[in-house]
Each structure stands twice: as structure tokens, then as C-alpha cells.
Amino acid sequence: MSIPLYEVLILASILFAMGLACVVAWRANVIMMLIGIEIMLNAVMLTFVGGSAHWGIAEGQVFSLMIMALTSAEVSLALAMVAYLHRRKQSVDTDDFSSMKG
């Protein structure tokens, strides 16, 4: 039994909207922005996998693996910057990133 594509797209749209709302609502907090971006990328991965299953091709799953690799690199770099900023400023606000040099 397979889930219809429109249900996958509806779920992905809801996830993307939740991630976008998270990014827009908590623009001052870097960690919440990262969580919102991760939710949006998971919605994109769900769309790729759903389309891949619907049309019977493997490219969507390959793109999902590429997105997973991209997000792991993004999270590791972003969390390193957040840890550095927290050590220097005792804060994780986005306004404090303007003081970083490099």
C-alpha cells in the first residue's frame, strides 16, 4: 500500500510552513533559526522521496542523501560558530554575529 502523492505534498507543505514560521518568528536566536532551516530541508527531502516513490525513479532518494550530507556539514559549521559566539559574548543572538571577524 502506497501513500498518495498529494498527501505527501500536503505534509511537506505543512512542514515547510512550520520551518518558515520558526525562522521568521525567532530571527534573533540562531539555534531556533537552525532548527527552522532543518525542518524546511526535511520537508524538501520528503517531497523528493515522495516523488521518487510515486514515479518509480531513484533520483529523489539520491537528492535526499545529498541534502542529508549538506545539512550535516551546515549544522556542524553553524554549531561551531554558535559555540564560539557563546563563549565570547555569552549570547546566541544574531546581532552578535556582526562582531565576529574573519
From Swiss-Prot:
InterPro entries in UniProt: NADH_UbQ_OxRdtase_chain4L/K (IPR001133), NUOK/Mnh_C1-like (IPR039428)
The enzyme's E.C. designation: 7.1.1.-
Membrane topology category: Multi-pass membrane protein
Magnesium among keywords: no
GO biological process: ATP synthesis coupled electron transport
Function: NDH-1 shuttles electrons from NADH, via FMN and iron-sulfur (Fe-S) centers, to quinones in the respiratory chain. The immediate electron acceptor for the enzyme in this species is believed to be ubiquinone. Couples the redox reaction to proton translocation (for every two electrons transferred, four hydrogen ions are translocated across the cytoplasmic membrane), and thus conserves the redox energy in a proton gradient.
Family designation: Belongs to the complex I subunit 4L family.
Protein name from the UniProt record: NADH-quinone oxidoreductase subunit K 1
Species in which this protein is naturally found: Geobacter sp. (strain M21)
Gene: nuoK1
